[in-house]
């Protein structure tokens, strides 16, 4: 069970409060604005968090001074734990990125704790463990944290009533994690086959025992799911709207970028006029969970990722060191763009640059 500080909810920051051309970000806040008193049951401590706003005053000098990683050993020796994103860092689609096995082996040999965090909710932790194994990587299930798991862990952290149900817009990973956590659910891939036949006076029914709608990446997304989720959120008192992530794009294959989970979440935002509670990166829920579980000091963590608005912001929100790799969605031109307000501590071409005391030139 998580500490109450970890159990605080994630609340969205209004897009009107952001700098021009920056993307919405999320921070921890009490759930009191989203849940009925009957749901809360006193399990959530009210915390007077102010929404995090990206302004010139809180972009720190440290964040403004990105350096190319030149001394890999110095960074490695300065932290105890490395948190790695997966897509674009460890693999692209189903292809392993060059040098990854040797890099992970080297870090383990140096006594470093390795954790793998992904916003991809299509698989459970166990299923991700099999993917690591298929790619020839020796990774323990306890080292893997997917946003599918984060959704179930979040519901556990707020003592979500076991007599309430969760409607899932997403794939098998979310269903498996909810089942392992002991929650009732409906929806998922099966609802991808459902269609709505509109007739005069037609009224779509929905389950009034649904207390949360969880939205993640969904290749079976359709109008039925949008309407069902909308009805639950708008008509069931205290119903939570939870998003595993708001990633704009994802890597289903290594050939191109594909529309990400944010496109599914956006549809529900539009229909409900509600902002979701985001449990994946860049919200600090998973970072707080990991720090709580492993007893990690956040100052002793380096977050390694390929996305500025999720991975790097995730690390910065958690007070960690950050390393951007250019093996995924972010290019050097995007990093150096005047419009980019999210600057990592370091950047390099790929994680195998750790193998050289003097990192490769980008």
Curated annotation (Swiss-Prot):
Molecular function terms from GO: phosphoglycolate phosphatase activity
Keyword vocabulary terms for this entry: Acetylation, Chloroplast, Hydrolase, Phosphoprotein, Photorespiration, Plastid, Transit peptide
PANTHER family noted in UniProt: 4-NITROPHENYLPHOSPHATASE-RELATED, HALOACID DEHALOGENASE-LIKE HYDROLASE DOMAIN-CONTAINING PROTEIN 2
Chief location: plastid
A single Gene Ontology CC term: chloroplast
Residues annotated as the enzyme's active site: 80
Chain's role: Photorespiratory enzyme that dephosphorylates the 2-phosphoglycolate produced by the RuBisCO oxygenation reaction.
Transmembrane helix in keyword set: no
Gene Ontology annotations of biological process type: photorespiration
Enzyme class name: hydrolase
Phenotype of gene-disrupted mutants: Chlorotic primary leaves soon after germination and plants not viable when grown under ambient air, but normal growth under CO(2)-enriched air.
UniProt subcellular location: Plastid, Chloroplast
Modified residues (N-acetylthreonine): 55
EC number: 3.1.3.18
Domain of life from the UniProt record: Eukaryota
Phosphoserine sites (modified residues): 356
Name of the molecule in the record: Phosphoglycolate phosphatase 1A, chloroplastic
Location of the transit peptide in the chain: 1-54
Family recorded in the similarity comment: Belongs to the HAD-like hydrolase superfamily. CbbY/CbbZ/Gph/YieH family.
Catalyzed reaction equations: 2-phosphoglycolate + H2O = glycolate + phosphate
């Amino acid at each position: 069970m998580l500490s109450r500080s970890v159990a605080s909810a994630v609340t969205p920051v209004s897009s009107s409060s952001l700098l021009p051309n920056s993307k919405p970000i999320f921070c921890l806040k009490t759930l009191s604005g989203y849940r009925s008193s009957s749901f809360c049951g006193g399990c959530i401590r009210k915390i007077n968090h102010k929404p995090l706003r990206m302004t010139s005053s809180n972009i720190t000098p440290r964040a403004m001074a990105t350096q190319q990683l030149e001394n890999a050993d110095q960074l490695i020796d300065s932290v105890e734990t490395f948190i790695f994103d997966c897509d674009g860092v460890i693999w692209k689609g189903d292809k392993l990125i060059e040098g990854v096995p040797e890099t992970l082996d080297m870090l383990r040999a140096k006594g470093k704790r390795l954790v793998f965090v992904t916003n991809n909710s299509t698989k459970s932790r166990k299923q991700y463990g099999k993917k690591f194994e298929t790619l020839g990587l020796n990774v323990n299930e306890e080292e893997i944290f997917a946003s599918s798991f984060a959704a179930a862990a979040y519901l556990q952290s707020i003592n979500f009533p076991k007599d309430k149900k969760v409607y899932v817009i997403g794939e098998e990973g979310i269903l498996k994690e909810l089942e392992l956590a002991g929650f009732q659910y409906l929806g998922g891939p099966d609802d991808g086959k459902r269609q709505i036949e509109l007739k005069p006076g037609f009224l779509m029914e929905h389950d009034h025992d649904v207390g949360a709608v969880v939205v993640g990446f969904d290749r079976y997304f359709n109008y039925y799911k949008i309407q069902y989720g909308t009805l639950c959120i708008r008509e069931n008192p205290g119903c939570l709207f939870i998003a595993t992530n708001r990633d704009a794009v994802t890597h289903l294959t290594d050939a191109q970028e594909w529309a990400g989970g944010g496109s599914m979440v956006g549809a529900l935002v539009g229909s409900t006029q509600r902002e979701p509670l985001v449990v994946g990166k860049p919200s600090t829920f998973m970072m707080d969970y990991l720090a709580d579980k492993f007893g990690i000091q956040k100052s002793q963590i380096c977050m390694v990722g390929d996305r500025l608005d999720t991975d790097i912001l995730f690390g910065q929100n958690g007070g960690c060191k950050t390393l951007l790799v250019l093996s995924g969605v972010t290019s050097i031109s995007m990093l150096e763009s005047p419009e980019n307000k999210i600057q990592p501590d370091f950047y390099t071409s790929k994680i195998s640059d750790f193998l050289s005391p003097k990192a490769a030139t980008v």
